[in-house]
Design a protein with these regions (language model features):
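Predominantly soluble domains enriched in secretory-pathway, periplasmic, or organellar proteins
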Residues: 1-242
Length: 242
């Protein structure tokens, strides 16, 4: 349901995929990209008199993540969706959702170097420092920096972070991506400017961290912090980001 922020009235009930998991605004603010757990991506035009779907695509059988390109000069040029099954991500035309490049995520685990045949794509965000998507692969524990500046000659930087990556969000500078490795009770900090792992935060992290995007605010004592809640306990942990 799309609700008018002023009148609080329902403007339209838009047909989407099953159990919408993620909603992402386009850089322009005109379009809303949503993905259901059934891997259906909907492109909704919010500037129409009655906002509704203008494009729909199924990228697989099960999915969790979608986003659009945000780097200067590439704003909304591309969209990306990551799927649980098949284990892959799909780069699409940002205006039409036409699939342009499909890449499998099968590979080796970061710790034991064992081959994993079906590692699921968890959270995806778009870098503000480079023309790259940050793609987190759950079972292998790899964070992929996918360079979309030339998708016909795709370049991917693979950062070994931690296994069982799930959701996460930017710190306040949008340089550092804070992603939960939930079954390892760890927060991995990835530098999206230098493309490297900065730190694995374990001290103080509770059981099964599940931040969503997390929350950034300035603590009066500790300064800038990023906060996460947990599925396995009732704690909220603050991580300093200055």
């Amino acid at each position: 349901a799309l609700i008018d922020g002023d009148t609080k009235k329902i403007i339209n009930i838009v047909k989407t995929g099953y159990a919408v998991h993620i909603s992402r605004m386009s850089h322009s603010g005109r379009y809303l990209y949503v993905i259901g757990r059934d891997a259906q991506v909907n492109l909704i035009d919010l500037w129409m008199k009655k906002p509704d779907n203008v494009a729909v695509i199924k990228t697989g059988l099960e999915a969790r993540s979608v986003d659009t390109s945000k780097y200067k000069g590439y704003e909304d040029k591309y969209a990306i969706a990551g799927t649980y099954w098949p284990p892959q991500y799909t780069i699409m035309n940002g205006d039409t959702l036409e699939p342009l490049k499909i890449v499998a995520t099968r590979g080796y685990t970061v710790d034991t170097q064992e081959y994993h045949p079906e590692p699921r794509v968890a959270s995806i965000v778009a870098s503000h420092f480079k023309p790259e998507f940050v793609v987190n692969v759950k079972e292998t524990g790899q964070t992929l920096m996918v360079d979309y500046s030339d998708i016909n000659n795709l370049k991917v930087t693979t950062i070994g972070t931690e296994r069982f990556l799930h959701d996460g969000g930017w710190d306040s500078s949008k340089r550092y991506f804070m992603v939960a490795a939930n079954q390892r009770n760890t927060i991995a900090v990835v530098d999206a400017k230098d493309n490297k792992l900065v730190k694995l935060v374990t001290e103080g992290v509770g059981k099964i961290p599940h931040p969503g995007r997390g929350a950034n605010f300035v603590d009066p004592k500790h300064g800038p912090v990023w906060a996460t809640s947990h599925l396995g306990d009732d704690s909220v942990v603050l991580i300093g980001t200055d």
